[in-house]
Amino acid sequence: MVCPICNAKTKVGNPCKKHTCKFAPKCSSHTKVAVKKSNIPGAGKGLFARNDIARGETIANYKVGTQKMNHGQFIKKYPTGRATHVWSPAKGIYFDALNLNTSIAGAANRASGNSNARINGGGKMVTKTGIKKGVEILVNYGSSYRL
């Protein structure tokens, strides 16, 4: 497998030269989050803060690295009409983040209680509160979760 180069800039403005095989387009040095084993029993992987993240910061974009589908494509892929990593911002538009090799957004688990992040209308995952280093990022996907 050929790993892409991180698309971030260094502090002096030069392109980063590190490779990133997972969670493109940035390497682990240039992301605010990391994927690790979730604290939620049976959830598998989860998304965690690598450092403290302030309220209102964008931590991922559900439209980057996801598969965009129309309703027909969604039903073909998910015949039951139910999916766990799909966000639907509008009727007939779906973004599938099931492939964690291309989308870090899909690693954020659903909050069963209080969420500390949300997905805005533009698909950006934004912190609702300040999140301390090491804390799992949880999102209330609302009615678009498990469609």
Regions found by a protein language model. Give the residues of each.
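Short, surface-exposed beta-strand-loop junctions and turns on beta-sheet-rich folds
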Residues: 23, 67-68, 145
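A generic structural signal for residues embedded in beta-strands
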Residues: 8, 61, 137-140
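Intrinsically disordered, low-complexity regulatory regions of eukaryotic proteins
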Residues: 1-39
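Catalytic cores of histone-lysine modification enzymes
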Residues: 31-115
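Residue-level "contact hotspot" at macromolecular interaction interfaces
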Residues: 9, 46, 52, 129-132
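C-terminal SET catalytic tail plus cysteine-rich post-SET Zn-binding segment of SAM-dependent SET-domain
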Residues: 110-147
